[in-house]
Amino acid sequence: MGARASQEPRTRVRAGLRVLLPVLLLALLLLALVAPGAQGARGRGAADKNSHRRATSSFSQSVSSLFGEDNVRAAQKLLSRLTERFVQGVDMFLETLWKVWMELLEVLGLDVSNLSQYFSPASVSNSPTRALVLVGVVLLAYWFLSLTLGFTFSLLHLVFGRFFWLVRVILFSMSCVYILHKYEGEPEHAVLPLCVVVAIYFMTGPMGYWRGSPGGLCSPSVEEKLEHLENQVRLLNIRLNRVLENLDRSKDK
């Protein structure tokens, strides 16, 4: 009991860091996206641009003087290459998933070349069959997405164990980098994908069903087992006290 009470502040701090770190990262990304648009919309003059450039140049000069200009350039080249390869790998992965999804739709007898006909309001209202097909496609897409995410994150949780939260933060950061790289010229279009990534991040957190033990997706976690054991110990103490009280009463009589 005492050991667990001493560990409660640590677990709270860790949980707070797990939530605070991605939130801060998302806030920085949103500021980086919104700030240029807000400055352009408000019509700020050249003084703001010059101040921004001065701050950027001073920061780059300080970093170059600290680590060396050659090292900074080498690090920039390495990061750019890693980012490009990462984006290419994610594109290949998404393309593979899209091909699998198209094959599933073809197996169901849907016209993959013209999917827009199933989503038009006129065709849905005129043909109830298409409405049923549309509902089936949406449910199938939800099932396919949930199955993919569930299998991926349950495998990661099984492999990394306690460090799964760190893997989640890294994947969250890499997803944000991918989205910002894809929408580099159109930052306003990156807001919705970033929100989707944030939603997936919190869905795969402590409230997600794949945060359970490896024995099953719906099995109780370690904290629930500890709480159950505490309740059992309390019940045993209560029963033991009652037995001792009954023994004392019998002796007094």
Curated annotation (Swiss-Prot):
Residues 219-253 form a coiled coil. InterPro entries: BRI3BP (IPR033367). The modification Phosphoserine is found at S250. It is found in: Mitochondrion outer membrane. Keywords: Coiled coil, Membrane, Mitochondrion, Mitochondrion outer membrane, Phosphoprotein, Proto-oncogene, Transmembrane, Transmembrane helix. Its main location: mitochondrion. It comes from the Eukaryota. The chain crosses the membrane at residues 19-39, 131-151, 164-181, 190-210. One of its GO terms (cellular component) is mitochondrial outer membrane. Pfam families: BRI3BP. It is a multi-pass membrane protein. Interacts with LETMD1. Interacts with BRI3. Interacts with BRI3; the interaction is weak. Interacts with TMEM238L. Involved in tumorigenesis and may function by stabilizing p53/TP53. This is BRI3-binding protein. It comes from Mus musculus.
